[in-house]
């Protein structure tokens, strides 16, 4: 999860109010001052922070609140709402449609990670069932075509470019025409970048845009520039019809919050954020789930979406049926470990689970957790079918554990540790017994069927306490809206 430190500081500021006997003006000001410092240190502009602080004070009028109101919860809701408002440009971006050719043109300054982002964007849509293709119209930077070619080949995405042609407009037009004939429904044009905003860059962008008539122009921006993103985004918007922004390198800079809020202030929707060098370190940016994860509240619908990507559609009904029965076997644990490893970076996956802030997984711990999962799977590979399909850990006597340890090259104590993890997960799984399963076995509908009662059973006690108990859980679910919006958090709430 990006901006983990910022999210941790805001969350701690809210939690400190739990230690206060009476929440008065002084307690509220201390909380808001800490949040203000955290936002300013993340390079969010002072006017935006000041406006947010003022709005929260207007919403949370402590003198007007009747006795019996949960002031901490009302303050938390106001903070959530204002953070969403700060990051939301209030304008949706163009979304490509399958089986209909869409041309998307990428623009940006050199060094922002534009070419890599083009491939990530193509790869993301390829996983969603699109037929993407890449066109290299960057004739300015030496090695640009080689880089795009290498990335595209690795991701198994068709590409077009030239080592001899120097006219970017000609390459762009030929590439787009070629892929339209091949029935590609998402044609991505990578254009030249520059070291600074100069007239020749903007003129070339205008010419390529005029010739290819893109459905969407995406501006790629480096997050390290912080609130300076406002001027940069405005400059590009005035030169070409920028319809969306992708912010890169969000994993390595403290100024990401400033960049996000600055771009939102230009009314340009941020559609993705780059969180690392790898192909799957690329997240859809959706304001409510993002803020929810930032504050350690999770993003249940995002988790279900990722799970859907790795669980074949024909296997989803069977998995949901097992979930409703509450019968957890080692084979199910093995399959779910495999799914988790396929879902992308563990830090990102865990931040989608309510009550888990990204700060809870320190840097370097992700690899350790991944290695542990793989060790457990190696041990399970040494089990018999009967052992894997048993839901009774008592079948694992000393001789069986020694056999599994020898077969997997591990210690007996490690086998015992793996079985303890199994018992812990089995306990959580059993609490899902009786969950209403969608008739068509669609996992996305699972979110709508989960109410606060189910979620409170699944969450570990310390996480539930962090959210504010049962009342806090219900309140947070309501914050995300009702109906479709409810999926942005935990799924359907109590009616």
From Swiss-Prot:
<keyword id="KW-0963">Cytoplasm</keyword>
<comment type="subunit">
    <text>Component of a signal recognition particle (SRP) complex that consists of a 7SL RNA molecule of 300 nucleotides and six protein subunits: SRP72, SRP68, SRP54, SRP19, SRP14 and SRP9.</text>
</comment>
<dbReference type="Pfam" id="PF00448">
    <property type="entry name" value="SRP54"/>
</dbReference>
<dbReference type="GO" id="GO:0005525">
    <property type="term" value="F:GTP binding"/>
</dbReference>
<keyword id="KW-0378">Hydrolase</keyword>
<dbReference type="Pfam" id="PF02881">
    <property type="entry name" value="SRP54_N"/>
</dbReference>
<dbReference type="GO" id="GO:0016887">
    <property type="term" value="F:ATP hydrolysis activity"/>
</dbReference>
<comment type="function">
    <text>Component of the signal recognition particle (SRP) complex, a ribonucleoprotein complex that mediates the cotranslational targeting of secretory and membrane proteins to the endoplasmic reticulum (ER). As part of the SRP complex, associates with the SRP receptor (SR) component SRPRA to target secretory proteins to the endoplasmic reticulum membrane. Binds to the signal sequence of presecretory proteins when they emerge from the ribosomes. Displays basal GTPase activity, and stimulates reciprocal GTPase activation of the SR subunit SRPRA.</text>
</comment>
<dbReference type="InterPro" id="IPR042101">
    <property type="entry name" value="SRP54_N_sf"/>
</dbReference>
<keyword id="KW-0694">RNA-binding</keyword>
<dbReference type="GO" id="GO:0006614">
    <property type="term" value="P:SRP-dependent cotranslational protein targeting to membrane"/>
</dbReference>
<feature type="region of interest" description="G-domain">
    <location>
        <begin position="1"/>
        <end position="295"/>
    </location>
</feature>
<dbReference type="InterPro" id="IPR022941">
    <property type="entry name" value="SRP54"/>
</dbReference>
<feature type="region of interest" description="M-domain">
    <location>
        <begin position="296"/>
        <end position="495"/>
    </location>
</feature>
<dbReference type="InterPro" id="IPR036891">
    <property type="entry name" value="Signal_recog_part_SRP54_M_sf"/>
</dbReference>
<dbReference type="InterPro" id="IPR003593">
    <property type="entry name" value="AAA+_ATPase"/>
</dbReference>
<keyword id="KW-0342">GTP-binding</keyword>
<dbReference type="GO" id="GO:0005786">
    <property type="term" value="C:signal recognition particle, endoplasmic reticulum targeting"/>
</dbReference>
<keyword id="KW-0547">Nucleotide-binding</keyword>
<dbReference type="Pfam" id="PF02978">
    <property type="entry name" value="SRP_SPB"/>
</dbReference>
<dbReference type="GO" id="GO:0008312">
    <property type="term" value="F:7S RNA binding"/>
</dbReference>
<feature type="binding site">
    <location>
        <begin position="190"/>
        <end position="194"/>
    </location>
    <ligand>
        <name>GTP</name>
    </ligand>
</feature>
<feature type="binding site">
    <location>
        <begin position="108"/>
        <end position="115"/>
    </location>
    <ligand>
        <name>GTP</name>
    </ligand>
</feature>
<comment type="similarity">
    <text>Belongs to the GTP-binding SRP family. SRP54 subfamily.</text>
</comment>
<keyword id="KW-0733">Signal recognition particle</keyword>
<keyword id="KW-0256">Endoplasmic reticulum</keyword>
<dbReference type="InterPro" id="IPR027417">
    <property type="entry name" value="P-loop_NTPase"/>
</dbReference>
<dbReference type="GO" id="GO:0005783">
    <property type="term" value="C:endoplasmic reticulum"/>
</dbReference>
<dbReference type="InterPro" id="IPR004125">
    <property type="entry name" value="Signal_recog_particle_SRP54_M"/>
</dbReference>
<dbReference type="InterPro" id="IPR000897">
    <property type="entry name" value="SRP54_GTPase_dom"/>
</dbReference>
<dbReference type="InterPro" id="IPR013822">
    <property type="entry name" value="Signal_recog_particl_SRP54_hlx"/>
</dbReference>
<dbReference type="InterPro" id="IPR036225">
    <property type="entry name" value="SRP/SRP_N"/>
</dbReference>
<dbReference type="InterPro" id="IPR006325">
    <property type="entry name" value="SRP54_euk"/>
</dbReference>
<feature type="binding site">
    <location>
        <begin position="248"/>
        <end position="251"/>
    </location>
    <ligand>
        <name>GTP</name>
    </ligand>
</feature>
<protein>
    <recommendedName>
        <fullName>Signal recognition particle subunit SRP54 3</fullName>
        <ecNumber>3.6.5.4</ecNumber>
    </recommendedName>
</protein>
<dbReference type="GO" id="GO:0003924">
    <property type="term" value="F:GTPase activity"/>
</dbReference>
<keyword id="KW-0687">Ribonucleoprotein</keyword>
């Amino acid at each position: 999860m990006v901006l983990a430190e910022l999210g941790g500081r805001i969350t701690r500021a809210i939690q400190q109010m739990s230690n206060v006997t009476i929440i008065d003006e002084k307690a509220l000001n201390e909380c808001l001052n800490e949040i203000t410092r955290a936002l300013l240190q993340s390079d969010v502009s002072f006017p935006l922070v000041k406006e947010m602080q003022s709005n929260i004070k207007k919403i949370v009028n402590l003198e007007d609140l009747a006795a019996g109101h949960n002031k901490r919860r009302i303050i938390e809701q106001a903070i959530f709402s204002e953070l969403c408002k700060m990051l939301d440009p209030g304008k949706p971006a163009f979304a490509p449609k399958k089986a209909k050719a869409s041309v998307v043109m990428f623009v940006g300054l050199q060094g922002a990670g534009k070419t890599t982002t083009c491939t990530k964007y193509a790869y993301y849509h390829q996983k969603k069932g699109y037929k993407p293709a890449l066109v290299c119209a960057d004739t300015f930077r030496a090695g640009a075509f080689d880089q795009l070619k290498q990335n595209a080949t690795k991701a198994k995405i068709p590409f077009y470019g030239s080592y001899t042609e120097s006219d970017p407009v000609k390459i762009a037009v030929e590439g787009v025409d070629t892929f339209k004939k091949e029935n590609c429904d998402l044609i991505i044009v990578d254009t030249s970048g520059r070291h600074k905003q100069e007239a020749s860059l903007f003129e070339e962008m205008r010419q390529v845009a005029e010739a290819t008539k893109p459905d969407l122009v995406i501006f790629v921006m480096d997050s390290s520039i912080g609130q300076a993103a406002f001027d940069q985004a405005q400059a590009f918007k005035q030169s070409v019809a920028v319809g969306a922004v992708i912010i890169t390198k969000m994993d390595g800079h403290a100024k990401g919050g400033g960049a996000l809020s600055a771009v939102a202030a230009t009314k340009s929707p941020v559609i993705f954020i780059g969180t690392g060098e790898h192909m799957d370190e690329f997240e859809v940016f959706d304001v409510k789930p993002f803020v929810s994860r930032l504050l350690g509240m999770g993003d249940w619908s995002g988790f279900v979406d990722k799970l859907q990507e790795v669980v074949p559609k024909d296997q989803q009904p069977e998995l949901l049926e097992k979930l409703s029965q509450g019968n957890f076997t080692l084979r199910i644990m093995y399959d779910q470990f495999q799914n988790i490893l396929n879902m992308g970076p563990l830090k990102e996956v865990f931040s989608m689970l309510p009550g888990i802030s990204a700060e809870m997984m320190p840097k370097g711990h992700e690899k350790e957790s991944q290695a542990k999962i793989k060790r457990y799977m190696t041990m399970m590979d040494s089990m018999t079918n009967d052992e894997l399909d048993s839901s009774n850990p008592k079948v694992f006597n000393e001789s069986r554990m020694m056999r599994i340890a020898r077969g997997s090259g591990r210690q007996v104590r490690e086998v015992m540790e793996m079985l303890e993890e199994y018992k812990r997960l089995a306990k959580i799984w059993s609490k899902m017994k009786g969950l209403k399963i969608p008739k068509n076995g669609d996992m996305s509908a699972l979110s709508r069927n989960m109410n606060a009662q189910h979620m409170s059973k699944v969450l570990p006690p310390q996480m539930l306490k962090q959210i504010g108990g049962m009342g806090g859980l219900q309140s947070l679910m309501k914050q995300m809206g009702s109906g479709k919006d409810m999926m942005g958090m935990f799924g359907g709430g109590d009616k």
